Design a protein with these regions (language model features):
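Acidic, mature catalytic/reactive cores of soluble proteins
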Residues: 1-324
Length: 324
């Protein structure tokens, strides 16, 4: 399976914004390994080719990757793989220096392209049981099906022929809470975007109304087993629509950062371990990495910890909200 994860994109976007702000603030040149400079040159060349192609975004959702974007992806992905191969054991020791102005302009260009890609991802959306892809909630994952390829004359370790992809189409997955959680970091809150996103998530398939918490994923019904081990679990258990406290806390933290204070305290009343009823099992406060959601077939243990991994719920709470 060829795939991509949007959460990493959102995090990279934030990192680049930070680097640009620091470069603009101090105006100092930056020295990088020559191997990284080579990759940067290839990435900028791919952007030059994309700009020269005259590519423009379509108003319609297109699942077949346009040839211009495929060429861009292929060039950048190859550059990344070449870089990793060269530095897997050591760097050469050679360096390249970028002045602040050049570096700032480069990063600004990268940010524009990433922003366009993030908007494209939201337009393509998610897809699953009861999800028509029009929720406007940022997706977390995509898969890519290779639609045409050419044999390159090479073979793998067991003698099977290898091929180079020439085109591909996009496959969608259900919503995961990590998508909007990471995306909220990128919002500068123009037009109350954070509040709008919060309302979308609250009314989506990610909400466990019985527990007033959030599933780690929406329904996985009908998904391919290529998704991995999460498909082996019954709904409401472990990785299949259970409650992941560490991801929920990250989501609540973004509500705070977005100045959604009323929404934050409302969610914490249902999702914070500090508000667990005293009569509840001690396990709910001790080993609370994952909880059984309202979808689990045994209703008597809804909201109870799975005890699969031993993370302290209170440590998650303290780490996220008391020392951040």
């Amino acid at each position: 399976m060829v795939g991509s994860g949007m959460p990493e994109t959102y995090e990279l976007y934030q990192m680049l914004k930070y680097v640009k702000n620091v470069v603009d603030k101090y105006g100092r040149s930056v020295i990088v390994p020559s191997e990284l400079a080579t990759m940067i040159t290839k990435v900028n060349g791919a952007l030059d080719t994309l700009d020269a192609s005259g590519f423009s975004e379509s108003e319609e959702i297109i699942f077949d990757v346009p040839s211009e974007l495929f060429t861009y992806w292929d060039t950048v992905a190859t550059a990344r793989e070449d870089y990793r191969s060269k530095v897997s054991f050591y760097f050469s020791g050679n360096t390249t220096e970028y002045d602040a102005g050049t570096l700032s302009n480069m990063i600004e260009r990268w940010l524009r392209e990433m922003k366009a890609g993030m908007q494209r991802a939201i337009k393509i959306g998610s897809h699953g049981d009861g999800d028509d892809g029009k929720s406007g909630i940022p997706p977390s994952y995509f898969s890519y099906n290779i639609t045409s390829w050419e044999l390159n004359g090479k073979k793998n370790k067991v003698g099977l022929p290898l091929a180079d992809a020439k085109s591909m189409s996009v496959g969608r997955f259900p919503l995961f809470l990590e998508g909007p959680t990471r995306y909220l970091k990128t919002i500068d809150d123009e037009d109350n975007a954070a509040a709008t996103m919060y309302e979308k998530v609250k009314t989506s398939g990610l909400r466990d109304e019985e527990l007033s918490m959030y599933f780690v994923s929406a329904s996985l019904k009908g998904q391919s087993y290529d998704m991995g081990r999460m498909m082996a679990f019954t709904p409401g258990w472990l990785e299949n629509q259970s409650i992941w406290m560490h991801m929920s806390y990250k989501y609540y933290l973004e509500l705070l950062r977005g100045k959604l204070f009323t929404e934050f305290f409302s969610e914490m009343r249902g999702g914070g371990t500090c508000y667990c009823e005293i009569s509840n099992s001690f396990s709910k406060c001790s080993f609370i990495h994952q909880l059984n959601s309202c979808l689990y077939r045994n209703v008597t243990i809804h909201g109870s910890a799975t005890l699969w991994t031993f993370f302290d719920g209170m440590l998650f709470f303290l780490g996220k909200f008391c020392f951040c």
